[in-house]
């Protein structure tokens, strides 16, 4: 008797087609970075970038030497007190002299090029600044390094508020270099054959987005002209700009622009 083998039943396999998702690019309305919502690395990068550009870099109290504290806002210059005299039952008023109060968590520090930790922290901050300003990332040696004599060619000042670096200015020494020029503010044209005797050059100045319009940039400028050269306070017009951005031009106009007899506004710059 012959045996018949039943044919084996083939298992069906479900085919799955995998399509790569099309990257969806969006631009953050607050920090202005463009990133892909489908990319995990982009999402992480945006989160970091967003926080740094809006709120500044977290800053250790051990970084930098405090050279200026920000005065607290006072509603009254003097405090009035009154008391009742036991002798004649009259109310007598007197005033205490006003005292300068300072914010405990708001100050400006100067970076020492000889202290590696604070230099690294400042360089990390400058990376953020240069990204936003679309500026070169290799122009930090003048304040972050020292020459053979142990001196630097500039200064970096950081504005710290609530344990975050929310502003920075880097200053280059340009005294006796003939690099000073006058720039026509509205056209960016350089005035020929005139060399102002400028002493300091503003390489970078930046304030994080959430702290703008609070006078921080002006405070940084004031500290720079008073503290960059030991024992010397330079005049405002001796503080020169380097290719100011649109917002930088507005700041320059209010801080140290000079009106020419032609009616044009000029700002000191250096090249």
UniProtKB/Swiss-Prot annotation:
Zinc fingers classed as CCHH-type: ranges: 26-50
Q: Does the keyword Transferase apply?
A: yes
EC number(s) per entry: 2.3.1.-
- PROSITE patterns (alphabetical): GNAT (PS51186)
The UniProt entry, under InterPro entries, shows: AcTrfase_ESCO_Znf_dom, Acyl_CoA_acyltransferase, ESCO_Acetyltransf_dom, GNAT_dom
**Would you tell me the Gene Ontology cellular component terms?**
chromatin; nucleus
Q: Where is this protein localized, as stated in its record?
A: Nucleus
Assigned keywords, A-Z: Acyltransferase, Cell cycle, Metal-binding, Nucleus, Transferase, Zinc, Zinc-finger
SUPFAM superfamilies, sorted: Acyl-CoA N-acyltransferases (Nat)
Any GO molecular function: protein-lysine-acetyltransferase activity
Q: Does the keyword Acyltransferase apply?
A: yes
Where in this chain does the record put each N-acetyltransferase domain?
109-271
List GO BP terms, alphabetically: mitotic sister chromatid cohesion
Q: What does this protein do?
A: Probable acetyltransferase required for the establishment of sister chromatid cohesion and couple the processes of cohesion and DNA replication to ensure that only sister chromatids become paired together. In contrast to the structural cohesins, the deposition and establishment factors are required only during S phase. Acts by acetylating the cohesin complex component SMC3.
The record's family statement is: Belongs to the acetyltransferase family. ECO subfamily.
Protein name per Swiss-Prot or TrEMBL: N-acetyltransferase ECO1
What gene name does this entry carry?
ECO1
């Amino acid at each position: 008797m012959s045996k018949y083998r039943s044919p084996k039943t083939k298992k069906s396999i479900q085919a799955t087609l995998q399509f790569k998702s099309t990257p969806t690019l969006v631009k953050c309305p607050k920090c202005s970075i463009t990133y892909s919502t489908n990319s995990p690395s982009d999402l992480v990068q945006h989160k970091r970038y967003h926080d740094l550009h809006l709120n500044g870099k977290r800053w250790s109290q051990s970084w930098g030497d405090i050279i200026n504290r920000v005065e607290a806002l006072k509603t009254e210059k003097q405090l009035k007190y009154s008391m009742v005299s036991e002798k004649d039952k009259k109310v007598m008023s007197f005033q205490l002299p006003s005292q300068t109060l300072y914010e405990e968590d708001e100050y400006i520090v100067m970076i020492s090029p000889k202290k590696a930790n604070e230099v690294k922290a400042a360089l990390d901050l400058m990376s953020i600044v240069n990204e936003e300003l679309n500026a070169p990332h290799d122009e930090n040696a003048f304040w972050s390094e020292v020459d053979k004599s142990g001196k630097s060619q500039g200064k970096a000042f950081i504005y710290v508020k609530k344990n975050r670096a929310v502003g920075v200015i880097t200053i280059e020494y340009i005294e006796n270099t003939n690099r000073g020029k006058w720039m026509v503010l509205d056209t960016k044209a350089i005035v020929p054959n005139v060399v102002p005797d400028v002493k300091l050059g503003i390489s970078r100045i930046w304030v994080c987005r959430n702290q703008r319009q609070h006078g921080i940039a002006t405070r940084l400028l004031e500290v720079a002209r008073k503290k960059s050269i030991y024992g010397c306070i330079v005049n405002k017009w001796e503080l020169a700009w380097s290719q100011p951005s649109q917002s930088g031009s507005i700041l320059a106009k209010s801080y140290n622009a000079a009106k020419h007899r032609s009616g044009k506004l000029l700002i000191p710059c250096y090249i």
